[in-house]
Amino acid sequence: MSNLKQLRTRIKSVKSTQKITKAMQLVSASKMAKIKSQIANSNFYIEAVSKMMSAILSIDMYELSIEEQKFFNTVPNKANLLIVMTSQRGLCGTFNYSIIQQVKNDIKELENKGEQIKLIIIGKKGYEALKRQYVNYIDSYFELPKIHDENLMLQVKQKIMSAVENLEVSNCVIYFNKFKNAMTQIMTRQQILPVAKYQDDSMIDNPIVNLVGFGYKERGAKPINNRSATSDIVGESKSIDYNYEYEGENLISNLINLYVNSQINYALLQSRASEEGARMTAMENATNNANDLISKLVLKLNRSRQAIITTELIEIIAGSEAV
């Protein structure tokens, strides 16, 4: 009987765990859907800013100031700034493992070359995995808030901008998981700075038309009066709605800020969507495994009960025959 009690207790415990994993699966699915919507809404803006920045390198109409040149040129003999985006919580499968392993491999390669390294880590899991071995490389650590927070993006951007402006780093690379679907996340290593030259000939051939779509004609020019324009930056016609805040003289500086902001925002959104997708898949697998385990335990319980009943019947029959 004690064996039956243990089986019932275990079944009850597994069912309780199954309810938790199922709830976590549904919560992650809801969060993932919301973040996917945010990604869809921001994709065009992020791509447009990136291509505008890259196109500046291909045209001669803009004379970059000394401060602006720091964001477009590699500074020799300075540190490599690695930004690592991981999760704040666990229970998300191999989401963090692929990022951490890639970072460790790259750090080892940079160490072999004798290069300097700086780390900015976002997310508790990445910090815990890297702090013991690379504590001397860690420049900053940020905890990941429960919801997408612009303050985090601004803090990370400020760290990057400060490091570049003070000539502390030669380049900036960001590591994050790119969302493909709930079951697939792609480990991505993307260079933010220096800004890479854009290779699309259509953009280079007619840069003024594309930049006019964003409200400027050339350095020093005033913003155009109309509030919407058609841009061909991403290869298709789309209406862009915008507000004017800056004179053309500050165009490059403000574009640099927009560019760094957009890259960090893109990586954060992709990482969050990937995390929730990985957690949803992990919890779905856990729920299914719990269901299989419950079925096996119930079968074992029924067999044990049947064995006890059979034994008792045999004893009763044997006793009656003896009488």
From Swiss-Prot:
User: Quick one: a GO cellular component term?
Assistant: plasma membrane
**CDD domains per UniProt:** F1-ATPase_gamma (cd12151)
Q: Name one Pfam family in it.
A: ATP-synt
Keyword Glycosyltransferase included in the entry's annotation: no
Which keywords does UniProt give here?
ATP synthesis, Cell inner membrane, Cell membrane, CF(1), Hydrogen ion transport, Ion transport, Membrane, Transport
Family assignment?
A: Belongs to the ATPase gamma chain family.
Protein name (Swiss-Prot/TrEMBL): ATP synthase gamma chain
Please tell me the species this chain comes from.
Answer: Rickettsia rickettsii (strain Sheila Smith)
The encoding gene? atpG
